[in-house]
Design a protein with these regions (language model features):
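Short, Lys/Arg-enriched N-terminal segment that forms or immediately precedes the first helix
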Residues: 1-5
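Intrinsic disorder
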Residues: 6-9, 41
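Short, amphipathic alpha-helical "recognition" segments used to contact nucleic acids or chromatin
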Residues: 8-30
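Secondary-structure boundary motif
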Residues: 21-25, 38, 56
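Short alpha-helical "recognition helix" segments of helix-turn-helix
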Residues: 32-39
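Major-groove recognition helix of helix-turn-helix-like DNA-binding domains
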Residues: 42-59
Length: 59
């Protein structure tokens, strides 16, 4: 893996960590996505999974 790919991978991990932190702090999924600048490329399946997990966890 070249240096550019490592940098992109590191950045994506940071954005994902921020995204998950927003969700854990109670921010709705799509608001959390917007708060991260829509930078992290999430598939619809991933969003559905996160929404389901959030619903199970409750408020």
């Amino acid at each position: 893996m070249n240096r550019r790919n490592k940098t992109i991978e590191y950045r994506n991990r940071q954005i994902y960590a921020e995204y998950i932190a927003h969700i854990r702090n109670g921010l709705p999924v799509m608001d959390a996505y917007a708060a991260c600048g829509n930078s992290y490329d999430l598939s619809e399946e991933s969003i559905r999974k996160i929404v389901a997990e959030q619903a199970r966890a409750g408020p």
